[in-house]
Amino acid sequence: MKSDAFRAAAEAKDFRAAEDLFAPDVTFRSPVVFKPYEGRDQVQLILSAVVQVFEDFRYIEQVETGDVAVLQFETRVGDRQIQGVDILKFAEDGAISELTVMVRPLSGIHALAEAMQKLLESPTALR
């Protein structure tokens, strides 16, 4: 499946090694921010933060058809259990052109937003 390499990178918490999976003009839609992030550098920054915030992350389902894949996951942020999906859209060359993340419940979204804000505001937090 086209999404296997993305899944492996996410499960290994190693999106830096997977940079070439993303199209240069990839669009990332966050569950906590209305405006999408544009470009590979922005996506890499966000995903580098996410792997530090998510605890006990694991995919539980993967469905792919044509140029779209949906990967369902479970994770934790602090004491909040979260369920979510990564929706991947692929360009003709196989690169990921869009990544949309949706999570539930609302308390999990709040915990995620707070943890991400703290991490992204810290100049030394991202490794």
What are these regions (language model features)?
Residues 1-127:
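C-terminal and inter-domain tail/linker signature
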